[in-house]
Curated annotation (Swiss-Prot):
Mg(2+) binds at D105, N227. One of its GO terms (cellular component) is membrane. UDP-N-acetyl-alpha-D-glucosamine binds at residues 11-14, 25, 76, 81-82, 103-105, 140, 154, 169, 227, 333, 351, 366, 377. Co(2+) binds at D105, N227. HAMAP family: GlmU. It comes from Escherichia coli (strain K12). The keyword Cytoplasm applies. Pathway: Nucleotide-sugar biosynthesis; UDP-N-acetyl-alpha-D-glucosamine biosynthesis; N-acetyl-alpha-D-glucosamine 1-phosphate from alpha-D-glucosamine 6-phosphate (route II): step 2/2; Nucleotide-sugar biosynthesis; UDP-N-acetyl-alpha-D-glucosamine biosynthesis; UDP-N-acetyl-alpha-D-glucosamine from N-acetyl-alpha-D-glucosamine 1-phosphate: step 1/1; Bacterial outer membrane biogenesis; LPS lipid A biosynthesis. Residues 1-229 are annotated as: Pyrophosphorylase. One of its GO terms (molecular function) is UDP-N-acetylglucosamine diphosphorylase activity. The keyword Magnesium applies. CDD domains: GT2_GlmU_N_bac, LbH_GlmU_C. This is Bifunctional protein GlmU.
Length: 456
């Protein structure tokens, strides 16, 4: 079906009192992303011409957190109901576009459901998203005559008979811009709450003989709102369960789907295995046959084929070629790069450093601002001293170098191909190819030495 141009209004002005937080409710995160950002992303994916964000409390924090050029910020200085919120945005509506109304605290609404609602909207009428609940207490009820939607009655204003209705309003609707502006202008606050309800436009449309079509979401979780942290945690588990199910069906082996968190997007090859309590953040790519041990965090990184990441390793903004092994307890910070077959062992940290093909840093090492060649051995306790308190400097190590344990490389420094650095050496000058560098304090020995004894 050919759709009209469309703009989206997202209501995000609520205080979120029940969150007991200084952060605006809609900025609390689900799957690593602010709830309202999920809704903004859905609006953009639908092709919204404009996204009008109605805000009130915490406006400065919202503007700091949400960097989207497509956002039009609309202030609702007083919170006088959903209808009042829409009235603030109405001056921005074009007559010939459709207006879709969404909520910043309903984060799991799907693009597929919204597109079905958009397609179902009748010409000159309203598309309304509704669901049926076993216990609809507290929700606005959908009233019908001969099967046709005639209005929405809020729970506090409903009669005992109307409260028996199980079909409820989700608050999500779509209508033409000109119609929306006209109906909004007619709203009154003659109700138990003394507020302007957006739901009253349904009765106004019905009185004009306009058709109102109700559409149901694919899943109830799509229209569940968040008012407290318990509800947010439940939606988090719903979302994570759905993501885990998709990955399992796509061939990823999750050892325990209930103990896996995806906080971004995961692209993967075949026969990937992920153990328990692994967190994937941002954009992550895993090649074929990648294995990730328990407790790992992988963020914005590319992991090549046949890599193995041992437990409790953190990888952020890093790039691993094929057949690399990392961990346990390793940390790859932004700019870390491992070439094919490289190994980083336990308690090794890398930042802005490249480790060449087949090179190894087995344990207890810091490699920062370093370029390390192929087939290099980095001994335990090696440190690249890259910072003088004001500036960073680079360490370059050629191919086939052997670096002994407890070595300090004071940058800027270059170690030539095939060189050997003796254990305990502090390297302050360049080392030539195939040379041995050694710097040690002469060892002295005192025979018959007795340790001091504490006086009682």
């Amino acid at each position: 079906m050919l759709n009209n141009a469309m703009s989206v209004v997202i209501l995000a002005a609520g205080k979120g009192t029940r969150m007991y937080s200084d952060l605006p409710k809609v900025l609390h995160t689900l799957a690593g992303k602010a709830m309202v950002q999920h809704v903004i992303d859905a609006a953009n994916e639908l092709g919204a011409a404009h996204v009008h964000l109605v805000y009130g409390h915490g406006g400065d924090l919202l503007k700091q957190a949400l960097k989207d050029d497509n956002l039009n910020w609309v202030l609702q200085a007083e919170q006088l109901g959903t209808g009042h919120a829409m009235q603030q945005a109405a001056p921005f509506f074009a007559d010939d576009e459709d207006i879709l109304m969404l909520y910043g605290d309903v984060p799991l609404i799907s693009v597929e459901t919204l597109q079905r609602l958009r397609d179902a909207k009748p010409q000159g009428g309203i598309g309304l998203l509704t669901v049926k609940l076993d216990d609809p207490t507290g929700y606005g009820r959908i009233t019908r005559e001969n099967g046709k939607v005639t209005g929405i009655v809020e729970h506090k204003d409903a009669t005992d008979e109307q409260r028996q209705i199980q079909e409820i309003n989700t608050g999500i609707l779509i209508a033409n811009g000109a119609d929306m502006k006209r109906w909004l202008a007619k709203l009154t606050n003659n109700n138990a709450q003394g507020e302007y309800y957006i739901t009253d436009i349904i009765a106004l449309a019905y009185q004009e003989g306009r058709e109102i079509v109700a559409v149901h979401p694919q899943r109830l979780s799509e229209v569940e709102g968040v008012n407290n942290r318990l509800q947010l945690s439940r939606l988090e588990r719903v979302y994570q369960s759905e993501q885990a199910e998709k990955l399992l069906l796509a061939g990823v082996m999750l050892r325990d789907p209930a103990r896996f968190d995806l906080r971004g997007t995961l692209t993967h090859g075949r026969d990937v295995e992920i153990d328990t309590n692994v967190i994937i953040e941002g954009n992550v790519t895993l090649g074929h046959r990648v294995k990730i041990g328990t407790g790992c965090v992988i963020k914005n990184s590319v992991i090549g084929d046949d890599c193995e990441i041992s437990p409790y390793t953190v990888v952020e903004d890093a790039n691993l070629a094929a057949a690399c092994t990392i961990g346990p307890f390793a940390r790859l910070r932004p700019g870390a790069e491992l070439l094919e077959g490289a190994h980083v062992g336990n308690f090794v940290e890398m930042k802005k450093a490249r480790l060449g093909k087949g090179s190894k840093a087995g344990h207890l090492t810091y490699l920062g601002d370093a370029e390390i060649g192929d087939n290099v051995n980095i001994g335990a306790g090696t440190i690249t001293c890259n910072y003088d308190g004001a500036n960073k400097f680079k360490t370059i190590i050629g191919d086939d170098v052997f670096v002994g344990s407890d070595t300090q490389l004071v940058a800027p420094v270059t170690v030539g191909k095939g060189a050997t650095i003796a254990a305990g050496t502090t390297v302050t000058r360049n080392v030539g190819e195939n040379a041995l560098a050694i710097s040690r304090v002469p060892q002295t020995q005192k025979e018959g030495w007795r340790r001091p004894v504490k006086k009682k």
